[in-house]
Amino acid sequence: RLGSDVLQLKPKEYELLLYMGQHKGQVLTREVILEHVWGWDFVGDSRTVDVHIRWLREKIEQNPESPQRIITVRGAGYRFEG
């Protein structure tokens, strides 16, 4: 839920949001996110994380272009502020 709205998340979006929520306030690198959400045997591009972050922002941010919940930490990764 986001306020009174029920969010419709895809399974991987849910896993990503859950993982980030469990590490609120911590900077998480793409590699760490990939390992914990997609698994150590994931074959693909780390930009997969960026795409899923963008999809989540579109669903949970009031203004996805100026996010307040999922923050990009330039050169490091992402931080979830809740």
Model-assigned labels for residue ranges:
Residues 3, 38, 74:
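ABC transporter nucleotide-binding domain catalytic core, centered on the Walker B motif
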Residues 22-25, 40:
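Short helix-capping/hinge SLiMs at alpha-helix to coil transitions
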